[in-house]
Amino acid sequence: IELTSKLIALHFNHENKQSSAFESHCRDFCNELNINFESQNIKIAVSGEGFEAAARLKRMNILKSLPENSLIIQGHHSDDQIETVLFRIIRGTGLKGISGIPRVAKVGENKILRPFLKETKENILEFLSKNKINFVEDHTNNDISYSRNFLRKEIIPRIKDKWHSINENVSKLTEITKDQNSLYEHYLKDKIDDLKDDAGLTIEGLKKLDTFERSEVIRLWLDMELVTTPNHSQMKEIEKSFFQSRQDANPVIKFERSDRQRVGVILKKINKTLVMEKFDE
């Protein structure tokens, strides 16, 4: 590695029983390679599935706070991609969700690169063994009470036994749906541009769209503003309150994500315009 002076290994210490051992292993490994090492402590009050979401949010907030134009390299592999796509399908998702983990993404003013997304976990473990590189594994990854672990330990191995090319096929699926979603969003962005005024989206313009197209326009508009996007039931409430109520009604709807990965949003009607306000409690 030529740019070791600019390369920093960032470790997240989740302050559980094995955290100190994990941090020591990573620090020693980086010292051997002359790589700068930093550790950030993350303390989470909740447990279970809530812990995973809260920890993910704190990690992303730390990555956002890094110096502008940082390039963040993460180690997600193709087995992680299978897990993510299946998990999203089970929870209910659309094109964007099925497109999975992106190879390149933005977090704040920084860029995330995931160069191993097409590599299998098996290939990575084989490389580590061949090169005699020691590694540690989080014992909580074996706890199948976590939904993702259940998929990883119980479901995905059985799928692989039946369909040996699942890694390549899911990778192909995510690339296709990513391109399809990009085309779809390009169409919706043109609609948003037509409907925009200085405050938000015009109610009359939105009413000219059919119900599904209207809901997709509103979702993408909010997504572009980096706020919480409504789920199916919240979208039905928006439809009823803003587009099926009396013209003189002035509805206000407030919603947020339970994992707080994005700020909450308040939707209201002001002067025949659908207006969005952010809130973060």
Model-derived segments and their meaning:
Residues 27, 64, 156, 219-223, ...:
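Generic solvent-exposed, charged/amphipathic alpha-helical segments
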Residues 2-3, 160-165, 222-230:
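Short helix-capping/linker segments at secondary-structure and domain boundaries
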Residues 152-154, 158-170:
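Conserved anion/nucleotide-ligand pocket segment
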Residues 141-149, 167-178:
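Internal, active-site/partner-interface "lid" segment
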Residues 48, 52, 167, 232-235:
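Short, structured helix-loop boundary elements
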Residues 1-154:
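Core alpha/beta nucleotide-donor-binding catalytic domains of modification enzymes
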Residues 8-12, 42-44, 58, 105-109, ...:
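AMP-forming adenylation/ATP pyrophosphatase catalytic core
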